[in-house]
Amino acid sequence: MSYSVNFKFNPKRRLVLQAMAGAGLGAAFGGLGIGHVQAAGKKVTMGFLYVGPRDDYGYNQSHFEGKSALAKQSWIKAVDQENVPETIAVQKAMESMINLDGAQVIFPTSFGYFDPHILKIAPKYPDVMFLHCGGLYDASKHPKNVGSYFGYIDEAVYVSGIVAGHMSKTGKLGYIAAIPIPQVLRNINSFTMAARSVNPKITVQVVFTGGWSNPVKEAESANSLIDQGVDVLTCHVDSPKVVMETAEKRGIYSCGYHVDQSRLAPKGFLTGAEWSWSKVYLDYATMISKGTKIPNLIRGGFKEGLVKSSPYGKAVTAKARAHADEVRAQFMKGDFVVYQGPIKDNTGKEVIPKGKGYAQTDIWLESMDWLVEGVVGRTKG
């Protein structure tokens, strides 16, 4: 069971906090969806901040696409700002949206926006909600008008791993990642276990670039992995553009991340793990407009509509598609458990014993600090 803290939003009153056990995104949103038409309620002004450009073919673009989907709703005013660094600049940008645009809710989408920036600004504006994309919210110590939302993107990454496992001829996959934080490690491990469910001899070689956006090092890492025999590349960086283009240029397969990158690699693109923020943002807006209670902590995967897979590339075989579709269907029903023991890390240590399993909602998974068996790489040094 996950734990959520709910509060009721009213632009003319302070937020009221209620602690309660949360059943998950679907229950929290009460079945609302992107096609939902708002009933009688107040207009909503929402502000979005991105650490990079809106069209980066990656993380920032995924949020921009979610924001752009709101344009069809006349009762929502959405403002945004791109290329906002994780400095005091984000504080100024948030205050500008509140004071000049009248924003009632702010979505600071970058990991580094949370501490100290959101935590410093939120107490100054108790009638404004600050909803951070990530897993940093803690009800025991953070302001009442702060919350977080995130998707179980590793479900879609797992599906990509199945496809990669079917399509690899060398049995060597490559993963270019930014830094070894729990969410990144969870994606790497899910991808690896999925690929090895197809072929237990597969290995996944990981390179950490040390930063979310380092195109030079990303290109160097991609070429190095390909030179070592890797024939499928994927990544967890802010913009996968360089990795996808390098893989295509070198004639190998690729799996995307954040948004659909098939246009970057028309021959070698297999599939990808995508965010689906449009539903989240519309559902938040609807709840704010109606003054209904909003969970401080939101999580969801395929079943809740927060993540999706990119369409298959032309090269993907019927067998790979069928296997991936089958597992995705199990995720949709809530029947598939990725982290089911026995599982060993890549040093041979048992990290999850036989008979023990962790549901996606288990907080233990959000503190992951190990790499699974089959990964070539280290979390430190």
Describe the predicted segments one by one.
Residues 123-150, 259-267:
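Flexible loop/hinge segments that line or gate small-molecule binding clefts
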Residues 290-381:
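Segments of small-molecule ligand-sensing domains
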Residues 102-111, 131-133, 228-238, 256-257:
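Periplasmic-binding protein-like
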